[in-house]
A protein has these predicted regions:
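Bacterial N-terminal signal peptides that target proteins for export
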Residues: 1-12
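Short hydrophobic transmembrane-like helices used for membrane targeting/insertion
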Residues: 8-10, 32, 38
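Bacterial N-terminal signal peptides
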Residues: 10-20
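Signal peptide cleavage region of secreted peptide precursors
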Residues: 22-28
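Sequence context surrounding c-type heme c attachment/ligation sites in exported
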Residues: 28-30, 34-36, 44-66, 96-196
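Short, charge- and proline-biased low-complexity linear segments
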Residues: 71-86, 166-172
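N-terminal post-signal-peptidase region of extra-cytosolic proteins
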Residues: 76-95, 119-124
Length: 196
């Protein structure tokens, strides 16, 4: 009798272990699908322009500076690849030199929201923080590739929070050039490197 109850316990244990393994496998599958959804952004390209895949790893770049644009309710984190950060630390463009080819800027934009219900913040003294991701924009310096736009190529990718996907905004690598003409004296870069 004892051996029969032992067999039942072994069978029950094996059965429960199998269920646990299936649950883990399903969880891993969901994680892989989540990663694939995130990685899908690297297949997006501005027609006749920059591809998101050209900027792999931008999420880990150092911060150039942050900015807030109240008129359009956006918070921005401006990031730079190592070449951009090193050039900025050397004083470019303030020293009159242009950024070197290979410099890349990523601008991550979020809608902003006010925190008013967590101490020490209140309606009278709110904290402004990122809310929904709005877009990711890029500028890349390559004089040979972009001679008609002062050496800079531009790309903007709008984020759809509902579907979790990006889509290109505009066409061609010159889509941001007209706007950046206002920053010509700073090699067409609006946001200066913030000293630390």
């Amino acid at each position: 009798m004892k051996s029969k109850s032992t067999q039942i316990m072994v069978f029950a244990g094996a059965f429960l272990s199998g269920i646990g393994l299936l649950a883990l496998a399903a969880q891993d599958k969901d994680t892989v699908q989540d990663k694939e959804a995130v990685q899908d952004k690297y297949t997006v390209k501005v027609p006749n322009g920059l591809a998101f895949s050209e900027f792999r790893g931008y999420e880990d770049w150092q911060t150039v500076a942050v900015s807030q644009t109240e008129a359009i309710n956006l918070l921005r984190s401006i990031l730079g690849n190592p070449m951009m950060i090193n050039a900025a630390r050397e004083g470019i463009p303030g020293n009159g030199k242009p950024f070197p080819d290979g410099s890349v800027i990523a601008k991550v934009e979020w809608k902003q929201k006010k925190i008013t219900d967590q101490a020490p913040f209140s309606v009278k003294a709110p904290d402004t923080v990122p809310d929904v991701l709005e877009a990711v924009e890029f500028m890349v310096k390559d004089s040979r590739r972009f001679p008609d736009t002062h050496g800079w190529g531009y790309g903007e990718f709008l984020y759809d929070a509902g579907s979790g996907t990006f889509k290109p905004s505009g066409t061609g690598a010159a889509c941001g050039a007209a706007c950046h003409n206002g920053a010509a004296k700073n090699d067409y870069v609006f946001t200066p490197y913030a000293r630390r």
